[in-house]
From Swiss-Prot:
Gene: lyxi
Annotated positions binding Mn(2+): H103, H105, E110, H171
Protein name: D-lyxose/D-mannose isomerase
Signal peptide: none
GO molecular function: D-lyxose ketol-isomerase activity; mannose isomerase activity; metal ion binding
Record family assignment: Belongs to the D-lyxose ketol-isomerase family.
Length: 228
């Protein structure tokens, strides 16, 4: 992805968040120049835990078809050291018909919450013993109600609804066509993008950046490229 595209995507997402009165911490708005002027040491938790902006096309070249924009608000270390939080939180902009590809987590348990906008479609499968798709029924909890669905079921989450996904449940999600973009929340155990994502089809979790203009905001995996 090019910084020009990322800049535009983040501008759109900030406007989308503002529609729902979503407020982010001050560092969400720091420019690269501001980051470069700061003492790095007090901000080490942000860098180590990849807090902040994330724009990904999952290695694809069509962000509108496959991609996600999110901001990680809080996180902890796998194993609890050096950062003892046992939980994580994200706020996400899931665009209409924009797919987050099928994946599961070995360790993370998460609630995916439709905070507003359109409907969120979530497709579900269990993982089999070889990390492929199982044909077994999938058991999940929707807002405290335990439900079992056939493999490959697509559940529709309207604004206010949520789903709890346990480890080893494959899931893919997107904004339902005809209903607009979706404001999605995620509350989970510790998030470890480097070691706890299993995508059904191998892909890049973070997009490679091809320089064409300066970034207006830094992505969570780019801080150390810009900060001495």
């Amino acid at each position: 992805m090019k910084p020009s595209a990322v800049n535009q995507i983040l501008q759109q997402t900030q406007h989308f968040f503002a529609r729902f009165d979503v407020h982010l911490p001050p560092f969400a708005h720091f420019s690269p120049a501001v980051w470069q002027q700061l003492d790095r040491q007090p901000w080490q938790e942000v860098f180590d835990l990849k807090l902040g902006w994330d724009v990904t096309a999952f290695g694809d070249d069509d962000f509108a078809r496959k991609g996600l924009t999110l901001f990680t608000l809080r996180n902890g270390s796998p194993g609890g050291k050096p950062y003892a939080k046992g939980y994580a939180e994200k706020i996400m902009h899931c665009r209409e018909a924009q797919v987050t590809p099928m994946h599961f987590h070995w360790r993370k348990r998460e609630d995916i919450i439709n905070r507003g906008g359109g409907n969120l479609i979530v497709e579900l499968h269990n993982a089999d013993t070889r990390d492929g798709l199982a044909e077994t029924a999938v058991t999940v909890t929707l807002d405290g109600c335990r439900q079992t669905h056939a493999a490959g079921s697509r559940l529709r989450l309207a604004p206010g609804e949520s789903i709890c996904l346990t480890p080893a449940i494959y899931h893919s999600f997107w904004g339902e066509e005809g209903f607009g973009d979706v404001l999605v929340g995620e509350v989970s155990t510790v998030n470890d993008d480097d070691n706890d994502n299993r995508f059904l089809q191998p892909l890049s979790r973070f997009s490679q950046i091809e320089e064409d203009q300066p970034p207006q905001w830094l992505l969570c995996h780019e801080y150390l490229r810009f900060i001495a």
